[in-house]
Amino acid sequence: MKLSTIFTAFAATIATVAGYETTGSKQTVDILIDYIIKETPELSQNDVANWENGDTVTLQYVVNNNEESEITVVGVTGQFKNPINNEIVTNLTTGKVGPIAVPPGEAIKFDQKINVDLIPANYELIPHVFIAQDSLIKVIPCRGQLATIVDAAVSFFDPRLIFLELVLLITFAGLIYVGYEIWGKQYFKGVAPVKAKKVSAAKASSPVATGPSTTSATGYDTNWIPESHLKQKKTKKVN
C-alpha cells in the first residue's frame, strides 16, 4: 500500500467523520486496542482519574492485529463526553501517528499526549484510533476512562502570582502618589496648625512694681511691715 494513498484516505476520513461518528455500514474488525495512562498506570477502566487543568496526560496504546492482513496505524484522536447524558463536550486535536505498520498476529505501542484544559467537572475520555487497511481508513473507538478535572491550586509562591502582586502594589502606590500630589498637599496646607513664634529671654521685660515702695536703711522694703511694729522699733531707739 502506498503511503500517499494512506494519507489521502486519512485526510478524507477526518473530513467526513465530523463529531467522530462513522458513516456507512458498521464493520467488525479483529483489532484489539487498549491503553494505559503512563502517569498513573495502576488506573483501570473502573477507576476514576483525577486531573488538574494544566496537566499533560500520556496515553500509551497497545494495538493487536488479529486480522489476516497487515494494518497501519495512521492517526489518533478522541473526545471528552458528559458521562451522564453522553453528550460530546469537546473533541481532542487529531494527531498524526507514524504511520506504523502492524503485520498479522503482531502488536505495536505508541503514545498520545493530551493537554488538560476544561471546565472543572466529571468527564469520560474516549480515544479513537485511525487504522488503514485495504485502502480504507477505519475509526476504532477505545474504552472510556472516567475522569474528574479540577483547577490547579494556586501557590502563594507561584511566580505568576508574585508578578501580579507586584504589579498591583506598584499601581496602588502610584495612584496614592498622584492623589497626594493633586489633592493631598493643598488639603494638608489648609488644615495644618500655625506655630507660635518664641520670644527670646533677652527681649523679655523685667517685672514692674505696682505701687510706691520705701526702702529702709537696712536695705529692704518697709511697706509690708505692720505700723505697730515700726512704732515699737522707734520707741526703743528713743530710750
Swiss-Prot record:
Source organism of the structure: Candida albicans (strain SC5314 / ATCC MYA-2876)
Alphabetic keyword roster: Endoplasmic reticulum, Membrane, Signal, Transmembrane, Transmembrane helix
InterPro entries: TRAP_alpha
Name of the molecule in the record: Increased recombination centers protein 22-2
Subcellular location: Endoplasmic reticulum membrane
Entry function: Is probably involved in a pathway contributing to genomic integrity.
GO CC annotation: endoplasmic reticulum; endoplasmic reticulum membrane; plasma membrane
Region of interest called Disordered, as start-end residue ranges on this chain: 202-222
Lineage: Eukaryota, Fungi, Dikarya, Ascomycota, Saccharomycotina
